[in-house]
């Protein structure tokens, strides 16, 4: 896993025990999962809009910025639920080289 993701995971974990006024992440944890999920939703919409703008203009700088925000808030969500980013990377590794159709079919419940 990248050093950046590991370092960020460590900081996110440490912020769980911090006072809400000490950092943005600590304040999110203090407000609870619903607030964190609200931020993930907000950043998702902003990322989609930035992608549409990038497609029209060819400038991807805002798309990169919004994607970083989305990833960040997704990592906060995972940490709030006791998950480490490595779990997502492991899932991506598991899927690598597997056709998207085969992977989706493997997730379908049997009838």
Curated annotation (Swiss-Prot):
Swiss-Prot/TrEMBL catalytic activity: 1-(5-phospho-beta-D-ribosyl)-ATP + H2O = 1-(5-phospho-beta-D-ribosyl)-5'-AMP + diphosphate + H(+)
Pathway: Amino-acid biosynthesis; L-histidine biosynthesis; L-histidine from 5-phospho-alpha-D-ribose 1-diphosphate: step 2/9
Keywords for this protein: Amino-acid biosynthesis, ATP-binding, Cytoplasm, Histidine biosynthesis, Hydrolase, Nucleotide-binding
Catalytic activity, EC: 3.6.1.31
GO MF term set: ATP binding; phosphoribosyl-ATP diphosphatase activity
Signal peptide region: none
UniProt-listed SUPFAM superfamilies: all-alpha NTP pyrophosphatases
A biological process term (GO) from this entry: L-histidine biosynthetic process
Keyword Amino-acid biosynthesis appears in the UniProt entry: yes
Enzyme class per UniProt: hydrolase
Entry's localization field: Cytoplasm
HAMAP family: HisE (MF_01020)
Protein name: Phosphoribosyl-ATP pyrophosphatase
């Amino acid at each position: 896993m990248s050093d950046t993701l590991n370092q960020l995971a460590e900081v996110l974990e440490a912020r769980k025990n911090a006072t809400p006024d000490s950092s943005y992440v600590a304040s999110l944890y203090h407000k609870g999962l619903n607030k964190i999920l609200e931020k993930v939703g907000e950043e998702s919409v902003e990322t989609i809009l930035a992608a549409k703008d990038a497609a029209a203009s060819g400038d991807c700088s805002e798309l990169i910025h919004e994607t970083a925000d989305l990833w960040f808030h997704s990592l906060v969500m995972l940490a709030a639920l006791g998950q480490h980013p490595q779990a997502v990377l492991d899932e991506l590794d598991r899927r690598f080289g597997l056709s998207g159709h085969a992977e989706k079919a493997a997730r379908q419940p049997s009838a």
